[in-house]
Amino acid sequence: MEMKEPARLSRKKMFAVIGILAGILIALVIMLYLMIIALGNRNEANLLEAGQALHYTYDSHNAPNGMTLHVLKTRPADVTLETINNNITLSGKVGINGGFFYGEQLLSIGVVDSIPVNKEIGSFGTGSENVKYARGTLVWDGASDLLSVQVASKASELKVKDHTRFWAQGGISMSLGDDARWVEQTVKENAPFPGDDRLRSAAVYDEAGMLYLIVSETKGTLASFREAIIQTVGEGKLVDGIFLDGDGSSQLLSSDASLPGDNRPVVQMIRIVK
């Protein structure tokens, strides 16, 4: 009996089979992508699991000038300064970036209870001074539970009631109470790239002594960032604050938001710990 050769698939059926196989492959790729995203989100949630009990609130604001701000509001007593040498979004720690740095050297004041936060590095870049310039430094006096901005070159110049109960974060004066001369002050303090559109960070406080840690999602000049803060943060009751390191160093992590800047590591952060 003569065996017939199996009929070849028609061109139409062949395209149909190829289409089905391609569809299955695309579906598998999408499922794998979603699994990776879900795993990443779960890992971030696990990292911040202990942070869910922290005393802070998160909010975001779209300012009239187009800047989008992410804000962590907390009490200064619930905050510390910490060296991390990592991107904040990878640290598992709630907070934002801190002062200026170069390599692993901290170029801004960063002290807690009179101890420089980067003291392990040696004699330079420890956080004991605002290198080269007297700059606006946000100071929390634990004895009086009050915040202030003091222009200083060295941490030893700062005025507090008890030098064993305070923290101080260096930056650039924002001069919220002096709209006429704030730009002049930033020039004195050599604020970097004030006219460029860059990511920005800041720490400000209100009349009730609440602390606002702010990172922009959109780029803007120093002036537009300051304007956005005045317009959207603190319900018109802000007292003063400082600009922090910016651009790729502008980073934030909370259970609600994750802003990695340009993914670079930063030396130091302002961390919410209570």
Predicted regions mapped to residue ranges:
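Fold-independent oxyanion-binding glycine-rich loops
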Residues: 74-76, 97-100, 136, 141-143, ...
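Mature, Sec-exported extracytoplasmic domains of Gram-positive
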Residues: 59-66, 75-77, 104, 175, ...
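Conserved, well-ordered active-site substructure
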Residues: 106-130, 189-205, 211-244, 249-274
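Zymogen propeptides
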Residues: 2-143
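Active-site-adjacent helix-turn-beta-strand microarchitecture at beta-sheet edges
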Residues: 105-194
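Beta-strand-turn-beta hairpins that frame and shape the catalytic cleft
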Residues: 64-67, 143-146, 206-212
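Short hydrophobic-aromatic micro-motifs
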Residues: 71-74, 94-96, 147-148, 174-175, ...
